[in-house]
Amino acid sequence: MNGWTNYESWNVALWIDNDEDLYNLAKDCVKESLNAVLACDKFVKILDSLGFGMIRTCTHDGVVIDYNNSIEYFKSRFNELKEVA
């Protein structure tokens, strides 16, 4: 999967990188966090709060955007996002 450990991580990364709102949210979370784990946690919590806890936030391909599917993205992109944030 283009260097990703599984389809879900690849799909979430694809959507974050190619959806302006998700990408900007990821940048904001990185800007306000000391490391990738904290940035990912903040990102997922914000997305969950937007759904008011009633629905799971998913990519348009139906992959859930949760911590497990997002952490690899934040670990691989943290420094890059920090530079542009």
Language-model regions, residue ranges each:
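Acidic interaction surfaces
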Residues: 1-85
